[in-house]
Amino acid sequence: SHFEGSTEEKETATVVDHDFMSYTQGMKFFDPHMHMSSRTTDDYQALADAGVVALIEPAFWLGQPRTGLASFKDYFSSLVGWERFRSSQFGIKHYCTIGLNSREANNEALAEQVMEILPLFLQKEGVVGVGEIGFDDQTAAEEKYYRAQLEMAKEMNLPVQVHTPHRDKKKGTE
């Protein structure tokens, strides 16, 4: 367990977990926003044990800038291929959204290249929308590529999964 605390707190947590598992036993769950690329197969097993039968994994910023188009292709390919396979081993249906994350929109030369390949990936099996797109630093480039991806979603008749900024959220959502 990731729960840290006194022995009494741990015992209480176990009781709560047991009660919760009894209460939800037999129920099925769908998680609409989960980043599985960074998780282990133990996490898939825990999800299956908890009754999760399907999830959507949005494309996102991996914590460091991608510096070339090949890294985007590899990442998008893993979402539509490898992660679907991994989740299927646990009886979980894996869907995803594909998009240029706001943090990576500020490298405009690379962003233009990514925009060219997005339609190819948006047509793949298991892709259910454009995302996760939106704002982070709230720059003109982020606005440009957000609007371009909204237009792409409209043309392809796909829903959009929106990312709101971590900082200055009010400004970024007005």
PLM regions: where:
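Mid-domain alpha/beta scaffold segments of enzyme catalytic cores
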Residues: 1-174
